[in-house]
């Protein structure tokens, strides 16, 4: 792995976002790290004191107080002496042994220090050989210095450790192993097998915090030495120390305490010393930090010898506690964070990491379907469509919901359950109403009308509403329609109760029929009174409540379902009102064409009329319209409901005349009937066949009616227009 090459890693972006947070924690972490450096360094040195005392008696060379850094360009010759009794497998095992075993081996072997004479046996030690080969490679180090990648050079760290009197025997398999020793280790078959298959080990939970007395780390006499001022420029403060679990082997421990070097204002500067400063960005290895870690591939493990080298004998050392240590994981080319440092990072970065992780875990499948410009265009058009001049008409359900919500909040405020606050309301952009509206022009070659995104009235542009009337009339009509709809809903609730009583009457005993019938009649009478079917003139048709009810499709259905429950007199009044204002109803029904729902109930009412009542109803169609010379018959021939109602009236009259039942007519009824039949035949002969519509039902006795009063030529002409089915030969009745 070439550490000198510049690599752009994804962690650089996370570090740029977290730079401010790292700067704030710099001062706090420095004191913790320096104290941990002193504690761990003194602890390891205190274990090596007996070894160094024995070496002082055996070796005449003394340790200099201020050792200078040896220049890498002048290395001394190295003699590689291999001992036959020291197998490579044993070297790997020594790396993972515990602290006590390491100290015993150091005492038994006589120890190895930097101050001793370089004999053949000492040159075989990789820790001793490291002193002759200059600076180490960054991938061979496993410390917080490689982690952070920020700050000083390796020379500062070497100076601090040399002044503290740390000898090479203190750290067996130190990261300062030379590259020649690395080549020697590469010849080891056991290590090569580990490099080929790096075992996956779960992450280690290294949260061991405690006091020095609890962990057995006692301060040594070296605390009073003057060299302490060189190592720690800040005063001594009682802090928690970084402790390592006694179960963790030496190969998993950092070679020296967690000590990130001092850093300048910039996080990464190009002026750092090449070859001595890590080019790897800050990579925290804590599971609480949301920075992805790189897996330990065999290619990366190849450079990790020394304290971080994987040992094939890792499992035998920890087989008794397999379940508890399944969480351990050998770190990569960087070390674990300080426990207290990791806790601070996790506390400060938890909201940011959770929000980022929440968004990353739910990718938008439609993210790339529309560009940002297209999204803004759609949003703008939708917001324009929300602007309505008649909110109660165009957005009735939202307005009703908002009014209900306001009433609920008012009740809660009245009871003291909630503080007074404004409810959340849909905010729509304010659009100035245009003085004049121009219809969208149809462009040749386009489908339908042109879609104009800047149109102030989208509903008008697509002909969703009529814009022929003035705005004031549209506004008044909207509120009037809303009032009619509310009135219809109230009457419908009463009608549902009447229909429920009618269904129950078929399942109750006969002695209770009278009670239910009385109750039903009472409710029907109440509905009839609410409808307020008072006669009116043509000028007041738009103000009549009953006619307004018939202008709504739901109102027509209400009357059609109510007619069977009304009495004969009440139903006759409704029939008369419908026939009197038939032109008005036909004109307002051009959009919905829902008048046909009234044909069936009205037909049953017509079949129950007497001859005198029939003449009174049919004569309403022969009276001329106000301010016009046309008759209602002319409009009736052009409307399906009108022509069907006219044919039904004529058919019922012919049925009464041809029956044997006494009609008990009034004086002049026959003359009125004859005049009406002649007038209908005259208008029917003048109307073009193309303008006539097909009726809902064509009675079969209409030609028999006309044969009583018309000649043969006129009958054939009417037959062709009505397209009646063929009937047996008939005889014309002379007039």
Curated annotation (Swiss-Prot):
Residues 39-93, 336-366 are annotated as: Disordered. Residues 49-59, 67-93 have a biased composition (Basic and acidic residues). GO terms for cellular component: cytoplasm; nucleus. Residues 346-356 have a biased composition (Low complexity). Keywords: Cytoplasm, Nucleus, RNA-binding. InterPro entries: Pat1-like (IPR039900), PAT1_dom (IPR019167). The keyword RNA-binding applies. It is found in: Cytoplasm; Nucleus. One of its GO terms (biological process) is negative regulation of translation. RNA-binding protein that acts as a translational repressor. Belongs to the PAT1 family. Interacts with ribonucleoprotein complex components. Interacts with cpeb. This is Protein PAT1 homolog 2. The lineage of its organism: Eukaryota, Metazoa, Chordata, Craniata, Vertebrata.
């Amino acid at each position: 792995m070439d550490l000198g090459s510049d690599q752009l890693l994804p962690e650089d972006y996370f570090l740029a976002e977290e730079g401010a947070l790292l700067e704030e924690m710099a001062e706090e972490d420095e004191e913790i790290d320096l104290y941990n450096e002193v504690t761990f360094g003194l602890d390891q040195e205190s274990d090596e004191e007996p070894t160094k005392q024995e070496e002082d008696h055996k070796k005449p060379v003394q340790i200099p107080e201020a050792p200078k850094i040896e220049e890498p360009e002048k290395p001394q010759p190295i003699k590689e002496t291999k001992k036959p009794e020291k197998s490579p497998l044993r070297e790997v095992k020594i790396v993972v042994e515990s602290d006590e075993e390491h100290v015993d081996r150091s005492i038994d072997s006589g120890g190895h220090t930097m101050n001793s004479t370089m004999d053949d046996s000492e040159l075989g030690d990789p820790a001793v050989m490291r002193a002759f080969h200059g600076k180490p490679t960054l991938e061979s180090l496993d410390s917080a210095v490689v982690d952070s990648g920020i700050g000083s050079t390796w020379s500062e760290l070497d100076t601090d450790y040399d002044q503290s009197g740390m000898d090479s025997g203190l750290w067996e398999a130190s990261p300062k192993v030379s590259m020649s020793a690395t080549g020697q280790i590469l010849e080891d078959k056991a290590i090569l097998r580990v490099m080929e298959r790096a075992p996956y080990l779960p992450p280690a939970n290294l949260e061991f915090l405690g006091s020095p007395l609890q962990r057995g780390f006692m301060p040594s006499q070296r605390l009073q030495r003057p060299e302490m001022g060189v190592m720690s420029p800040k005063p001594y403060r009682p802090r928690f120390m970084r402790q390592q679990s006694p179960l963790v082997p030496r190969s998993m421990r950092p070679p020296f305490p967690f000590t990130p070097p001092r850093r300048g204002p910039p996080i990464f500067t190009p002026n750092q010393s090449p070859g001595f400063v890590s080019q790897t960005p800050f990579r925290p290895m804590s599971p609480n930090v949301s920075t992805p870690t790189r897996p330990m591939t065999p290619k990366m493990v190849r450079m990790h010898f020394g304290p971080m080298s994987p040992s094939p004998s890792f499992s035998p050392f920890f087989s008794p506690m397999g379940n508890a240590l399944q969480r351990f994981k050998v770190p990569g080319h960087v070390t674990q964070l300080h426990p207290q440092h990791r806790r601070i990072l996790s506390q400060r970065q938890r909201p940011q990491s959770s929000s980022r992780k929440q968004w990353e875990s739910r990718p938008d499948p439609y993210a790339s379907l529309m560009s940002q410009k297209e999204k803004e265009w759609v949003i703008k058009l939708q917001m324009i469509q929300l602007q309505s001049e008649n909110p109660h008409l165009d957005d009735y359900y939202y307005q009703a919901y908002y009014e209900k919500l306001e009433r609920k909040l008012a009740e809660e405020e009245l009871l003291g359950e909630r503080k007074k606050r404004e409810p959340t309301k849909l905010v729509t952009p304010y659009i100035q109403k245009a003085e004049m509206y121009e219809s969208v022009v149809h462009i040749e070659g386009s489908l339908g009308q042109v879609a104009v995104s800047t149109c102030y009235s989208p509903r008008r542009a697509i002909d969703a509403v009529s814009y022929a009337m003035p705005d004031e009339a549209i506004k008044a009509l909207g509120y009037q329609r809303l009032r009619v709809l509310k009135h219809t809903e109230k009457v419908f609730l009463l009608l549902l109760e009447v229909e429920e009583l009618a269904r129950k009457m078929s399942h109750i005993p006969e002695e209770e029929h009278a009670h239910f019938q009385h109750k039903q009649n009472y409710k029907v009478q109440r509905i009839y009174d609410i409808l307020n079917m008072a006669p009116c003139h043509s000028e007041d048709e738009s103000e009549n409540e009953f006619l307004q009810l018939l202008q709504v499709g739901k109102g027509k259905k209400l009357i059609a379902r109510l007619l069977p429950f009304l009495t004969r007199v009440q139903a006759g009044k409704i029939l008369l009102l419908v026939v009197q204002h038939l032109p008005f109803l036909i004109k307002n029904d051009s959009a919905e064409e829902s008048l046909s729902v009234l044909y069936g109930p009205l037909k049953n009412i017509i079949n129950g009329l007497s001859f005198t009542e029939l003449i009174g109803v049919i004569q309403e169609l022969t009276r001329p319209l106000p301010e016009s010379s046309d008759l209602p018959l002319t409009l009736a021939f052009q409307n399906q409901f009108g022509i069907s109602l006219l044919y039904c009236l004529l058919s019922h009259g012919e049925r009464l005349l041809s029956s044997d039942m006494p009609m008990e007519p009034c004086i002049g009824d026959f003359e009125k009937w004859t005049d009406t039949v002649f007038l209908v035949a005259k208008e029917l002969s003048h109307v073009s066949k193309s303008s006539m519509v097909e009726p809902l039902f064509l009675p079969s006795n209409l030609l028999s009616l006309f044969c009583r009063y018309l000649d043969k030529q006129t009958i054939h002409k009417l037959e062709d227009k009505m397209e009646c089915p063929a009937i047996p030969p008939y005889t014309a009745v002379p007039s």
